[in-house]
A protein has these predicted regions:
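Short, well-ordered beta-strand elements
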Residues: 41-54, 92, 102-105, 124-127, ...
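Sec-dependent bacterial lipoprotein signal peptides
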Residues: 3-26
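N-terminal lobe/hinge region of extracytoplasmic solute-binding protein
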Residues: 48-98, 215
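Ligand-site clamp/hinge motif
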Residues: 205-208, 237-282
């Protein structure tokens, strides 16, 4: 079991480092003439992406096409640096009992979603319960399998979809507790996964519409999604965390062929691409 735990932690850190490395690359760069007021809006970077295969909902994503924009649109309890080291983002503190079966989580005050509504403890507990609930058929459901009551939310035919995980208890607007069904010492790392992002009340009123126009609390906010072409994010001026954008926005350009993206990198019409296609390395 300890070996499994270590393996999970390594995977968690690898995932975090990869997501963060990309996020840092984006938030750290911008065009050199971006300081000029005459060029307002030119300090926007373009990044390679594939078309998301699912709605832009944190708990319903399992591929990079959706994962990249979601990482920038949503702040979680913790964030990671390029080495995979965690630091608090929305969390004020995350404390576990001695056997790591209960966590007490306090969140910072003053955080808001881009629709102006506050980020509260319930923004997390309702989001996590929604994702865990089989009735809602979310791809990230299994991330919540160690939370008490998860098994009771797995028979979708008997559920309405709004049932809450019994292991989550809201203490007040800025504190909640998490009771687990078994010891999980890496839970405090897992809460940095995109699936653990908070959701505003508007999500629960119309999840389908939200998936096309997500409302987050991250360093960027959603502007538009032209399917199979591009996703446009702009800097969120109200973001209060440790991943502040150093540019005015990110435009994810959708490609079906890496070679086309690489050609755009070479011509200067694309700023960021994580890997070079094999054809470009042939001599």
């Amino acid at each position: 079991d300890k070996e499994n735990m270590n393996s999970m932690k390594k995977k968690a850190l690898a995932f975090a480092a990869a997501a963060c490395a990309f996020g840092m690359l984006l938030s750290g760069c911008g065009s050199s003439n971006g300081d000029s007021t005459a060029d307002k809006g030119s300090n926007v970077i373009t990044a390679y992406n594939s078309e998301p295969q699912n709605p832009l909902i944190p708990g319903d994503c399992n591929e990079t096409g959706g994962g990249k924009p979601l990482d920038l649109l949503f702040a979680r309890l913790i964030s990671f640096d390029a080495k995979g080291n965690a630091s608090n983002e929305v969390a004020e503190s995350i404390k576990s009992n001695d056997d790591a079966t209960q966590y007490t989580i306090k969140i910072k005050s003053g955080w808001k979603f881009t629709d102006g509504t506050p980020v509260t403890a319930e923004s997390f507990t309702k989001a996590w319960s929604y994702t865990a609930n089989a009735k809602n058929a979310q791809l990230g459901s299994s991330f919540f399998s160690t939370i008490k009551g998860y098994d009771k939310l797995q028979d979708g035919d008997k559920l309405k979809g709004d049932e809450q995980l019994e292991g989550l208890k809201v203490v007040n607007d800025h504190e909640f507790t998490v009771d687990l069904n078994r010891s999980d010492s890496v839970f405090a790392v897992k809460v940095g996964y995109t699936a653990f992002a908070p959701l505003p009340e508007s999500f629960f009123k119309d999840p389908k519409a939200f998936g096309e126009k997500p409302v987050g609390n991250g360093p960027y906010k959603f502007q538009s999604w032209d399917h199979d072409n591009q996703i446009v994010l702009v800097k969120n001026p109200d973001y209060k965390g440790n991943r502040v954008a150093k540019n005015d926005g990110v435009t994810f350009k959708v490609y079906t062929k890496d070679e086309a993206a690489y050609a755009d990198i070479q011509s200067g019409s694309l700023d960021v691409m994580e890997s070079v296609p094999a054809s470009a390395t042939k001599t």
